[in-house]
Amino acid sequence: MFRPDQVHDVMKRHTIGDGEPIVIDFEKSFGTHLVDAKTGQPFLDCSSQFASMPLGWNHPKLKEKMESINLYAVHKIANSDYYSVPLAEFVHTFAGIAPDFNHFFFVEGGTLGVENALKAAFDWKMKKLGLSEADANSLDVVHLEQAFHGRSGYTLSLTNTFANKTALFPKFNWSRIKNPKIHFPLVESETTVVEELSLRQAEDALKTNRVAAIILETIQGEGGDNHFSSEYFAALRKMAFEYEAMLILDEVQTGVGLTGTTWAYEHHAGLRPDMIAFGKKAQVCGFASTTRIDEVPDNVFKQSSRINSTWGGNIIDMIRFTHIAQIMKEDDILNRVAIVGDYFLKQLLTVPRITNVRGKGLMLAFDLETPEARNAVLDNLLKRMTVLPCGERSIRLRPHLIFSMADVDEAIEIIKHAV
């Protein structure tokens, strides 16, 4: 067995080896703190494995519930074709937290969740129009500047955060529209002008009758933690109906409680997308669809193997999520996130120097003056806590959903010292 101080040498020998300097101590990490196995230092965890760990490290209830996984851990199950009781329990549980949707597809990886939502939309649009295979490459997807939807397959044509993630790979020239992100404190007139331009660009593309989907992150993550107005979502919703396109919201990062609601789109009254992509805190990735897809009788949920994968998600992840969902309900986690998140946001507003403080629930971010200033502050923060950069000069916080007021106070003390 390797020692903690050997880990990075091994990784650099066989892989790119550019991971974080921390080596996870699985035994000693606790609650909202990640412990470095090399030094024993605890770090306040405000990245939560890129927003994938809702209940923190070694949650006592989750540890107790997961003690029985040995029977399942020794098997790798092809869940798409071989069903089991844990699979059914997971699907039932997941459907319960997404009552707006009727069809579900599960897969490994958020990118593949987005990709299969796109495939479902392409299939639906082609059959709606009565088009042939010869017309397939004429389809379009409306998407935003600064979008991040993944880095393989169709998503390469959507992601446009940093060029090194998509450059030199073949891509489709799909319609990219202006980003009407809100700057805080809100200057409504400025936002409205950009929204109007963005919506005109979207409608121009939709008028070709070749747009299969409008896709956007409910709150953009890597692109800068960018928020959009309810009016903007409502306008896109109306256009998607009018021009027969699917409205797809990418909730891979925002979903399952991070914003204080199960899905971030719930913050926008009356908004109901046709599809959502999910992952991260859901432990299993995929997409969900409303019955709008049933306007085409032989849609992807009616044709065997039209979309599929060998594993259809991992059974251990499914068992874990079933327990996570139960604990979140028992402990009223969503209400906790809303309360603690509001406190966190207000405390961030007291920090000197940082600007554009923004957030919903525990999905929080702030800006520095320049990219160089951001990087310097980031380096200081990483000495005591885990955080993530985003956009050109932003820092994003992705705490575990069990974050407390005391954790917020600790975070604010670290941030004030770092800036």
Go through each PLM region and give its residues.
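Conserved N-terminal phosphate-binding loop of PLP-dependent enzymes in the Aspartate aminotransferase
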Residues: M1-V419
